[in-house]
């Protein structure tokens, strides 16, 4: 996928609500997410890999991984508002992508996370 097309698709996602500074929430713009995930793809090749998006926010990085061919993405998010946006963004994907996504509501470091050997 071309960087411009990936950036445009990611820019259409509902943005992260960024309401809780105690969770160190930051929004990632579509252009940055696209170039970052394309760099990861060039280094490790996302196609066929299992990815975990910790502190997923609106899901922009994990969704990019799905668009670049990741086999499955587990999105981990603790914030209720961000999880709502994340679920909305995943539901807006076509079925071929959304069925390869799992959302876990968990606080990293506080909740017990069982992840099935992610690659990335």
Give, region by region, the residue ranges found by the protein language model.
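S-adenosyl-L-methionine
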Residues: 1-50, 85-116
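Conserved class I S-adenosyl-L-methionine
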Residues: 49-57
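Conserved SAM-binding motif I beta-strand of class I
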Residues: 72-77
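Conserved Rossmann-like nucleotide-cofactor binding loop
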Residues: 81
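Short SAM/SAH-binding signature in class I
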Residues: 118-120
């Amino acid at each position: 996928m071309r960087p411009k097309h990936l950036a445009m698709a990611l820019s259409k996602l509902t943005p992260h609500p960024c309401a809780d500074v105690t969770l160190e929430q930051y929004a990632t713009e579509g252009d940055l997410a696209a170039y970052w995930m394309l760099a990861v793809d060039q280094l490790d090749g996302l196609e066929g890999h299992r990815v975990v998006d910790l502190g997923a926010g609106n899901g922009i990085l994990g969704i990019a991984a799905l668009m670049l061919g990741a086999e499955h993405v587990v999105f981990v998010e603790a914030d209720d508002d961000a999880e709502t946006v994340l679920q909305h963004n995943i539901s807006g994907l076509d079925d071929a992508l959304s069925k390869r996504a799992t959302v876990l509501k968990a606080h990293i470091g506080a909740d017990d996370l069982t992840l099935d050997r992610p690659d990335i």
